[in-house]
């Protein structure tokens, strides 16, 4: 069952990364340079996924097994 969810997770991550690359860096602090490091990109991806968890809730919600 987990193997069937893998393509969906990869698709969501791909869309999220593309969105992060297309969107400007939003911060309350003035940034002197654009963030290009892997660590920063990972943090931005995590922030995006946290803030958009309501949109992806239906994808990651467990199925109803009922008995």
UniProtKB/Swiss-Prot annotation:
Provide the species name.
Oryctolagus cuniculus (Rabbit)
Functional summary from the UniProt entry? Amylin/IAPP is a glucoregulatory peptide hormone that plays an important role in the regulation of energy homeostasis. Selectively inhibits insulin-stimulated glucose utilization and glycogen deposition in muscle, while not affecting adipocyte glucose metabolism. IAPP function is mediated by the CALCR-RAMPs (AMYRs) receptor complexes. Amylin can also bind CALCR receptor in the absence of RAMPs, although it is more selective for AMYRs.
- What keywords is this UniProt entry annotated with? Amyloid, Cleavage on pair of basic residues, Disulfide bond, Hormone, Secreted, Signal
Disulfide bonds, paired cysteine numbers: 35-40
Assembly with partners or alone:
Can form homodimers. Interacts with IDE and INS. Interaction with INS inhibits homodimerization and fibril formation.
Q: Name one GO biological process term.
A: amylin receptor signaling pathway
Q: What is the UniProt domain comment for this protein? A: The mature protein is largely unstructured in the absence of a cognate ligand, and has a strong tendency to form fibrillar aggregates.
Q: Name one GO cellular component term.
A: extracellular space
Propeptide residues are: 23-31
Protein known as: Islet amyloid polypeptide
